[in-house]
Amino acid sequence: MLDPRARTLLKTLIERYIADGQPVGSRTLSRYSGLELSPATIRNVMSDLEELGLVSSPHTSAGRVPTPRGYRLFVDTMLTVEAPIDAEAVARQVQNTLQAGEPQQRVVAAAASVLSNLSQFAGVVLTPRRSHVFKQIEFMRLSDKRILLIIVTPEGDVQNRMLATPRDYTPSQLTEASNYINAHFAGLSFDEVRRRLRDEIDQLRGDMTTLMHAAVTASTEVPDTEDTVLISGERNLLEVADLSSDMARLRKLFDVFDQKTGLLQLLDVSSHAQGVQIFIGGESTLVPIEEMSVVTAPYEVNGKIVGTLGVIGPTRMAYNRVIPIVDITARLLSLALSQQ
């Protein structure tokens, strides 16, 4: 547990390092901390913080820089997140970009772009998972013994299946079947629909039962699409010296973007948490590069979490600015998708 003096000096050191990108010495700490301490006293406190693993000394400088552990303590206990000065402008830009009524994939891709533009780092979005339940279905006659099954999920995703039936159906019969399913089974998984149809088979006409079973079978035979990660603004990170100054580190960074497996795992983990999460490289095993951090937040459709979005940038990022950008974007993306 740090005493107030050590906490103030650590907070000041991290804030100055984020702002300037240079190791912070005792003279700078004396100027910005607001504490009336001698350089010798400050050096003693810095030595204690170094022993605790919160700061380190680069070989080329007399100053110190925060470690991943120091950043974690900072964001967990010292960071004051306030609405940015341009909060209304940020919200307006997000709203203008995320137009309700647009196709879901386009809205989600726009969210990645707006995160990148506002943060000047990389924006990332885990696209909504395909729902295992349905909101509405419709049968459409195409020709003799060929029917188009249209499935609408709670997320607004529309899926089509082609059904080959043993007999022909009239449009009125198809309407009757879809009305029955929508009235009795909407909001359930197709596996649950299959189970209930077995229980109610005696109450239904044989032709309707055949059609419903064909619909359920077609819906469950098609495997779920894999989760997709959309990334925007990777090139912004080329301008970040912390990440681009070392070629091996830069190669590793773009391997993360190319393979996406690690990002998928990280975004999936954060989708099970409430609110904004901060993953710090070197401190989180989910972030493969020590100089990289990821700020994430889940987004919803009609109150149900369906994906995650975030910003990928250097560990030396202005967290107090990036956090509200991610939070605002997640909230407004949820609103746009829920209004579809």
UniProtKB/Swiss-Prot annotation:
<dbReference type="InterPro" id="IPR021153">
    <property type="entry name" value="HrcA_C"/>
</dbReference>
<dbReference type="GO" id="GO:0045892">
    <property type="term" value="P:negative regulation of DNA-templated transcription"/>
</dbReference>
<keyword id="KW-0804">Transcription</keyword>
<dbReference type="GO" id="GO:0003677">
    <property type="term" value="F:DNA binding"/>
</dbReference>
<dbReference type="InterPro" id="IPR023120">
    <property type="entry name" value="WHTH_transcript_rep_HrcA_IDD"/>
</dbReference>
<keyword id="KW-0805">Transcription regulation</keyword>
<protein>
    <recommendedName>
        <fullName>Heat-inducible transcription repressor HrcA</fullName>
    </recommendedName>
</protein>
<dbReference type="InterPro" id="IPR002571">
    <property type="entry name" value="HrcA"/>
</dbReference>
<keyword id="KW-0346">Stress response</keyword>
<dbReference type="InterPro" id="IPR036388">
    <property type="entry name" value="WH-like_DNA-bd_sf"/>
</dbReference>
<comment type="similarity">
    <text>Belongs to the HrcA family.</text>
</comment>
<dbReference type="Pfam" id="PF03444">
    <property type="entry name" value="HrcA_DNA-bdg"/>
</dbReference>
<keyword id="KW-0678">Repressor</keyword>
<dbReference type="Pfam" id="PF01628">
    <property type="entry name" value="HrcA"/>
</dbReference>
<dbReference type="InterPro" id="IPR005104">
    <property type="entry name" value="WHTH_HrcA_DNA-bd"/>
</dbReference>
<dbReference type="InterPro" id="IPR036390">
    <property type="entry name" value="WH_DNA-bd_sf"/>
</dbReference>
<comment type="function">
    <text>Negative regulator of class I heat shock genes (grpE-dnaK-dnaJ and groELS operons). Prevents heat-shock induction of these operons.</text>
</comment>
<dbReference type="InterPro" id="IPR029016">
    <property type="entry name" value="GAF-like_dom_sf"/>
</dbReference>
